[in-house]
Each structure stands twice: as C-alpha cells, then as structure tokens.
Amino acid sequence: MLILSRKEEESIVIGDEIVIKVVSIDKGSVKLGFEAPPHMLILREELKKAVADENLKASAQSDEIALTSLSQKLKK
C-alpha cells in the first residue's frame, strides 16, 4: 500500500484520468473530492461490502426458490 501525505487543497493523480483532492480536514475527518471518467465506479468501502452482502443473500434466496421449483417438477 502506498501512503502519501497531503494538505488541504492538495491533490493526488492516478494515471491520466483520476484526480483525488483533499477538500477539507476537520475534527478527525477528511473530505475528499474525486475527478474520474463517468464509467468509473467510485464507492465507499463499506457500501461496496453492503452491496456484495445483499447480492449473496439474493443469490441464496434465488437458489432456494429454484431448488424448490425443481423439486416440485420432479414430483410430478
């Protein structure tokens, strides 16, 4: 992991398309601004984990429904 120090209003550039700017620093919180192409998805880590968890739950429910349906068809 690369660790960099930046002050307020300073930026970090990733490749040719991404700029991360320190917008403000206040009471243990850092506000960041991101400039990136529209096709790039930018998510907070906890939101990405929540989406992945919901996808797993939905997949498990879908598998259960499919198995129940298949079981009923086999009984006929």
Swiss-Prot record:
The keyword Repressor applies. Gene3D superfamilies: Translational regulator CsrA. Transmembrane segments: none annotated. GO terms for molecular function: mRNA 5'-UTR binding. A translational regulator that binds mRNA to regulate translation initiation and/or mRNA stability. Usually binds in the 5'-UTR at or near the Shine-Dalgarno sequence preventing ribosome-binding, thus repressing translation. Its main target seems to be the major flagellin gene, while its function is anatagonized by FliW. Homodimer; the beta-strands of each monomer intercalate to form a hydrophobic core, while the alpha-helices form wings that extend away from the core. This is Translational regulator CsrA. The lineage of its organism: Bacteria, Pseudomonadati, Campylobacterota, Epsilonproteobacteria, Campylobacterales. The gene is csrA.
